[in-house]
From Swiss-Prot:
<dbReference type="GO" id="GO:0034227">
    <property type="term" value="P:tRNA thio-modification"/>
</dbReference>
<feature type="binding site">
    <location>
        <position position="118"/>
    </location>
    <ligand>
        <name>[4Fe-4S] cluster</name>
    </ligand>
</feature>
<keyword id="KW-0004">4Fe-4S</keyword>
<comment type="pathway">
    <text>tRNA modification.</text>
</comment>
<dbReference type="InterPro" id="IPR035107">
    <property type="entry name" value="tRNA_thiolation_TtcA_Ctu1"/>
</dbReference>
<keyword id="KW-0411">Iron-sulfur</keyword>
<dbReference type="InterPro" id="IPR012089">
    <property type="entry name" value="tRNA_Cyd_32_2_STrfase"/>
</dbReference>
<comment type="similarity">
    <text>Belongs to the TtcA family.</text>
</comment>
<feature type="binding site">
    <location>
        <position position="115"/>
    </location>
    <ligand>
        <name>[4Fe-4S] cluster</name>
    </ligand>
</feature>
<feature type="short sequence motif" description="PP-loop motif">
    <location>
        <begin position="40"/>
        <end position="45"/>
    </location>
</feature>
<dbReference type="GO" id="GO:0005737">
    <property type="term" value="C:cytoplasm"/>
</dbReference>
<keyword id="KW-0067">ATP-binding</keyword>
<keyword id="KW-0694">RNA-binding</keyword>
<feature type="binding site">
    <location>
        <position position="206"/>
    </location>
    <ligand>
        <name>[4Fe-4S] cluster</name>
    </ligand>
</feature>
<keyword id="KW-0820">tRNA-binding</keyword>
<comment type="function">
    <text>Catalyzes the ATP-dependent 2-thiolation of cytidine in position 32 of tRNA, to form 2-thiocytidine (s(2)C32). The sulfur atoms are provided by the cysteine/cysteine desulfurase (IscS) system.</text>
</comment>
<comment type="subunit">
    <text>Homodimer.</text>
</comment>
Length: 274
């Protein structure tokens, strides 16, 4: 690729800086780590790999990177694209082959959302493979907008106040998931992917399901952002500034024991009759 324009250079620096800040803030990568980068062939995971390869060069610690793609046997999946790209980069990689596509198509009725089952099958396979190769961290390409969308999806449809944490220990206790792009917005990632000309692989299984709940929430957030620029960032910051005493979860705050503090100074003010 040729010389970057001023704007492209600013964008690249911004993404690298924000990813570096997220990695540092949540202690995502430590000295000696083996980071398994989950590469789907989409803009987010390509950007993730690109940013982490740069971080590997400049970080004051040593860590390994291994790229892993899961071939789910979707019809028309271009098997040659990722190996060719990764060989050119000189990155160690593995292609994990597992026919989850057939499982999903068999179990999910036509027209119904496949994302949930597909995600669970993929996640379980990748967790197992990470354990097999001795990966200490599993890096995913979720960004700030994904996190905010998930927050609203859980609120609207599951009645829970949760999102995607930048760092997570899996339920099995053997895998730590990290999201280095947690501070990066999707618009920047899309622009970066465009000028870097990553060889994007479309998802034939879930990418065409335009009526997904996530897409509805995404459109809602985009509309809010158009009307009030900066709102998405403000919502994301709120996830880092939680005040349990101002919510209603009795497991997080002991409301039942709240009593008047008899030692507190009185607020009464002497009133002078006029």
């Amino acid at each position: 690729m040729g010389t970057l324009t001023v704007n492209q250079n600013k964008l690249q620096k911004r993404l690298r800086r924000l990813a570096g800040e997220a990695v540092a803030d949540f202690n995502m990568i430590e000295d000696g780590d083996k980071v398994m980068v989950c590469l789907s062939g989409g803009k987010d995971s390509y950007t993730l790999l690109d940013v982490l390869l740069h971080l590997q060069k400049v970080a004051p610690i040593q860590f390994e990177i291994v790229a892993v793609n899961m071939d789910q046997k979707q019809p028309g999946f271009p098997e040659y694209v990722l190996p060719a790209y990764l060989k050119e980069l000189g990155v160690e990689y593995h292609i994990v082959e597992k026919d989850t596509y057939s499982v999903v198509k068999e179990l999910i009725p036509e027209g119904k959302t496949t994302c949930s089952l597909c995600s669970r099958l993929r996640r379980g396979t990748l967790y197992t493979f990470a354990d097999e190769i001795g990966a200490t961290k599993m890096a995913l390409g979720h960004h700030r907008d994904d996190i905010v969308e998930t927050f609203f999806l859980n609120m609207f449809f599951n009645g829970s106040l949760k999102a995607m944490p930048p760092k997570l220990r899996a339920d099995d206790g053997r895998n730590v998931v990290i999201r280095p792009l947690a501070y990066c917005n999707e618009k920047d990632i899309q622009a970066y992917s465009d000028f870097k000309q990553f060889p994007i692989i479309p998802c034939n299984l879930c990418g065409s399901q335009e009526n997904l709940q996530r897409q509805v929430v995404k459109e809602m957030l985009l509309d809010w952002e158009r009307k009030t620029p900066g709102r998405t960032e403000s919502i994301f910051r709120s996830l880092q500034n939680v005040i349990p005493s101002q919510l209603a979860d009795r497991n997080l705050f002991d409301f039942a024991s709240l009593k008047i503090d008899e030692t507190a100074a009185s607020r009464f003010v002497n009133v002078v009759n006029l």
